[in-house]
């Protein structure tokens, strides 16, 4: 819709914003440094609205908490947009100059009044209207979201609905405003920038574009596929069907991180050959035929790109232990062993130069320049360009932004009499993703030793469970044990569990139904029940 797969604005702009709409983001636990900027903005007078099924820490300082039912984001966002149109709060000048498709959007929004949204979301209609008015009438108003928006079968629709809000209010190309996805891991942005996706080459250039493909074929001296690749969720399903016979796994613990993990394990058992490249022997290592020891961040050089497109150097501090090597060295040797004449790169700087020469967004970025400036934000199209802290200041980078009307679609799996609760999963402050690293550290383990399930008091009371009791959590795919935490943060009918613990893998429960565009699984909604042990 805008032409850039990243934050439109910079992290350091958050402190100067006047309004923050935080949706699907437990920012203080998943992005604590960014949360510090949000807290600073609120201390300086900014208003904050949080939309989340749980009462996260930010709700304590927010002006409003829209505690919606998991999976009903499109209803909430369309109802906010309905209010903005109905009350004449749109930026008509921006819409006329920079967008298309607004009339079609208005027709869709007519079916989403806040009063009807209240029935589905559980959020009072007047709260929806107040949030919409506050967002639309504040010039420096930013939207911040993470996996609570994208980890749904309709995650792409959620993002479209957010983008529609930004466009109709003219909050694009404005400092301390915009649409800002906060990336789930360090350098996820950089990995995507470099083409670690099934549909893009480096710099978000389409695999399906013959001119793009020809450029990379000439540069690399190979014939490239005309077809998009498989996303990870599709790969796991094809592996379970026996279509995929070999797997190369880098920095990923599949049997802890992927949904419906019993099916993943079936697929791994059926593979003919599996290679694991990682810094530790994680849970997936049990299935590997070959393990290649990799260097961690402090044992190699290169660049990390953070959520706001900021490219920064990572400098090697110590040598890797034993046979461990930097990822790029391992990959180059593998390519040569497979018969491809991979260049004898001097190091990561030369590899980045190759990417920058082929990707216009990064043409002006090099290790040498970052050494001088400290960092650079793309797009940076030339060596004398200063980088771009705020995108779209001269209008959408694709020329004209297009509104994308979306309709509400139910989550793939809803609660019923057999499985009456909605389970969402996520991260905690003390552990990081699959906890391959943090559970090897004494401090985080002391703070949080094992799995737990947050439950509303009335839901726990239905089965006679008390705080600290051990229960079984069951879904249509599996069962795990967890310690009950009676939590005022939870909506009735909803429970929440962390994803970190190998002993009780919550992804034995989760649903691998994925978004039709991205394939991202629906980690945020699956039907479960709890039983006393």
Residue ranges, per PLM feature:
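Long, low-complexity segments enriched in small/aliphatic residues
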Residues: 192, 197, 215, 348-443
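Residue-level detector of beta-strand face positions
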Residues: 389-390, 422, 470-472, 529
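Short, acidic Gly/Pro/Ser/Thr-rich loop/turn segments
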Residues: 28, 150-151, 430-432, 504
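Glycine-centered loop/turn motifs
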Residues: 399, 468, 491-493
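Short, solvent-exposed secondary-structure boundary/capping segments
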Residues: 488-500
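Long, low-complexity intrinsically disordered regions
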Residues: 515-533
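Cofactor-pocket helix-loop regions in the catalytic cores of large enzyme subunits
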Residues: 1-187, 206-384, 423, 445-485
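Flexible, small-/acidic-enriched active-site or ligand-binding loops
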Residues: 438-449, 500-504, 508-509, 515
């Amino acid at each position: 819709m805008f032409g850039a797969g990243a934050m439109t604005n910079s992290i350091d702009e958050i402190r100067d914003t006047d309004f923050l709409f935080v949706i699907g983001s437990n920012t203080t636990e998943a992005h604590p440094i960014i949360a510090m900027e949000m807290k600073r903005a609120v201390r300086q007078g900014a208003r904050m609205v949080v939309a989340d099924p749980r009462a996260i820490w930010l709700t304590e300082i927010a002006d409003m908490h829209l505690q919606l039912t998991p999976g009903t984001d499109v209803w909430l966002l369309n109802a906010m947009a309905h209010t903005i149109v109905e009350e004449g709060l749109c930026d008509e000048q921006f819409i006329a100059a920079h967008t298309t498709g607004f009339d079609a959007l208005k027709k869709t929004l007519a079916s989403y009044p806040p009063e009807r949204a209240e029935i589905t979301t559980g959020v009072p209609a007047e709260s929806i209207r107040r949030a919409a008015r506050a967002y639309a009438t504040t010039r420096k108003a930013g939207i911040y979201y993470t996996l609570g928006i994208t980890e749904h079968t309709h995650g792409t629709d959620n993002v479209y609905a957010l983008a529609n809000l930004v466009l109709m209010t003219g909050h694009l190309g404005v400092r301390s405003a915009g649409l800002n996805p906060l990336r789930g891991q360090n350098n996820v942005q950089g990995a995507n920038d470099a083409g670690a996706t099934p549909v893009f080459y480096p710099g978000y250039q389409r695999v399906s574009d013959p001119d793009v493909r020809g450029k990379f074929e000439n540069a690399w001296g190979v014939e490239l596929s005309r077809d998009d690749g498989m996303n990870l969720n599709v790969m796991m399903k094809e592996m379970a069907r026996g279509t995929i016979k070999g797997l190369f796994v880098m920095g990923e613990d599949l049997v802890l991180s992927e949904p419906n993990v019993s099916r993943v394990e079936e697929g791994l058992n059926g593979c003919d050959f599996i290679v694991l490249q990682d810094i530790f022997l994680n849970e997936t290592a049990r299935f590997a035929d070959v393990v290649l020891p990799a260097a961690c961040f402090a044992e190699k050089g290169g660049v990390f790109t953070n959520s706001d497109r900021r490219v920064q150097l990572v400098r090697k501090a110590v040598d890797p232990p034993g046979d461990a090597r930097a990822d790029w060295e391992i990959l180059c040797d593998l390519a040569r062993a497979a018969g491809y004449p991979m260049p004898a790169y001097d190091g990561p700087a030369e590899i980045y130069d190759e990417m920058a020469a082929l990707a216009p967004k990064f043409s002006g970025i090099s290790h040498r320049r970052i050494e001088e400036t400290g960092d650079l934000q793309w797009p940076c199209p030339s060596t004398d360009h200063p980088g771009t802290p705020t995108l779209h200041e001269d209008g959408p980078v694709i020329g004209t932004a297009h509104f994308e009307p979306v309709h509400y679609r139910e989550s793939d799996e809803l609660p019923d009499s057999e499985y009456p609760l909605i389970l969402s999963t996520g991260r905690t402050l003390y552990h990081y993703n699959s906890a391959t690293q943090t559970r090897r550290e004494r401090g985080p383990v002391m703070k949080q030793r094992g799995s737990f399930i947050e439950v509303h008091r009335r839901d726990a009371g239905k089965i006679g469970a008390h705080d600290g009791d051990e229960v079984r959590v069951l879904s249509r795919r599996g069962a795990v044990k967890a310690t009950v935490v009676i939590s005022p943060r939870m909506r009735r009918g909803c429970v929440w569990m962390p994803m970190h613990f190998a002993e009780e893998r919550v992804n034995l429960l989760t649903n691998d139904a994925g978004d039709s565009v991205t394939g991202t699984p629906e980690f945020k909604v699956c039907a479960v029940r709890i039983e006393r042990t």
